[in-house]
């Protein structure tokens, strides 16, 4: 297995994309430190990791809190002795109907705290161990296609994800001498509970019509890319943003000119 006995710390792994990444890496042989806001959500993923014959550690923590992040990393080191892979997946989207004038200071700060500060805090804490061990490492950040395109009512979320892109590139340059690969994945429209809850069916359908592939992706589509980036097969890849979006960012065809004959796939069973 490509990740046999590797140790991965994955934030926001209790559901959705984070859970899919954890299961994919577990299937590839890794042992997983499963972080989420609450132990209850993380435990569901941990049990599935253990069913794969791998070890799992549940660590509830808010990645927006630097002290909690330091404790999370230390707990992982205490349990497994090292961290080979960090996946900064935890994120938050707060709907802001009304645009920039409607978003509150609290919502703005929360989005930046989780989506940007969280990956920074986690990377800073993990990198100390990676550098000290002199064995390299892998950091994978989860950004979004919304780092590249703008639309209404996302004046906090989109800047936060764009900042993750530059954080990825900066860390890749800084950490290359230590053979620490830093890359990001930018999901497009993914069939997950989180997306359904935050956007609603009408908005999701509108996005689907914009996708050249004709369908939303599944959470496991992100999981497989993350597992590849965490493997030695991706050893010379660093500072890159891999968009997994069914061609969304490449297409400028007006929606009115698109064929609507694509079949609609069922909801992703792995996102539950």
What are these regions (language model features)?
Residues 3-33:
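Canonical Rossmann dinucleotide-binding motif of NAD(H)/NADP(H)-dependent dehydrogenases/reductases
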Residues 2, 80, 181, 216-244, ...:
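C-terminal substrate-recognition "lid" of short-chain dehydrogenase/reductases
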Residues 123, 160, 168:
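Active-site helix of classical SDR
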Residues 128, 173-177, 235:
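Alpha-helical segment proximal to the catalytic Tyr-Lys
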């Amino acid at each position: 297995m490509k990740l046999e006995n590797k140790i991965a710390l994955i934030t926001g792994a209790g559901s959705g994309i984070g859970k899919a990444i954890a299961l994919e890496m577990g299937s590839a042989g890794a042992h997983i430190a499963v972080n989420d806001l609450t132990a209850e959500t993380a435990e569901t993923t941990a049990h599935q990791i253990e069913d794969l014959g791998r070890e799992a550690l549940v660590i509830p923590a808010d990645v927006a809190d630097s002290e909690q992040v330091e404790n999370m990393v230390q707990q992982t080191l205490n349990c497994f002795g090292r961290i080979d892979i960090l996946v900064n997946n935890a994120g938050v989207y707060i709907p802001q109907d009304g645009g920039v004038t409607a978003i509150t200071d609290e919502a703005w700060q929360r989005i930046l705290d989780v989506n940007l500060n969280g990956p920074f805090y986690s990377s800073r804490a993990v990198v100390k161990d990676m550098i000290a061990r002199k064995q390299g490492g892998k950091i994978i950040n989860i950004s979004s296609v919304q780092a590249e395109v703008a639309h209404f009512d996302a004046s906090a979320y989109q800047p936060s994800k764009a900042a993750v892109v530059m954080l990825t590139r900066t860390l890749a340059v800084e950490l290359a001498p230590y053979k620490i690969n830093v890359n990001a994945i930018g999901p497009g429209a993914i069939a997950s509970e989180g997306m359904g809850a935050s956007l609603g069916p009408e908005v999701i359908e509108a996005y689907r019509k914009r996708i050249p592939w004709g369908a939303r992706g599944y959470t496991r589509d992100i999981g497989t890319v993350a597992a590849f980036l965490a493997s030695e097969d991706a050893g010379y890849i660093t500072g890159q943003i891999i968009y997994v979006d069914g061609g969304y960012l490449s297409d400028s065809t007006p929606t009115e000119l698109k064929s609507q004959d694509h079949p609609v796939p069922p909801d992703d069973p792995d996102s539950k």
